[in-house]
């Protein structure tokens, strides 16, 4: 989960980046900022209702990101109104603005032992970090939050490798963590 206190993940910062990329209009940005709190409450209630034993240990503002809001609202793109703003495009645009590489993860290119043997499932899920590959002596790690330096340092300590984060969508990282670690535990 991206650190929502990080200004780079604020609704204003994200709108500014999407505006600069011509993916949303000024009117859309204003409308999104007005709807943000209400939509976060809706998504928070949905999240809680999906849990068997809901534990209310956070506020909607801290558990639901602005990107979640954008995806829920299914925004039309300003540059191509026939298309919707999707998660891949949002994260790719943010990665470009942050000057961090973006990578669409191909699960067929991942090695089970590297993914599941580098960090624990609980750590991977908590920080949304997915080890992808070792390139030029560096561990490439996919994450929707390339600025979680503390978690990245922890992975460096455990793996004894320099870690290079790449941006990937939150849903891809979550899905592949569940699939790879689930498969790993099913065969052991």
List each model region and its residues.
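Short, low-order "capping/linker" segments at domain edges
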Residues: 174-188
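Non-catalytic accessory regions
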Residues: 1-152, 158-162, 167, 171
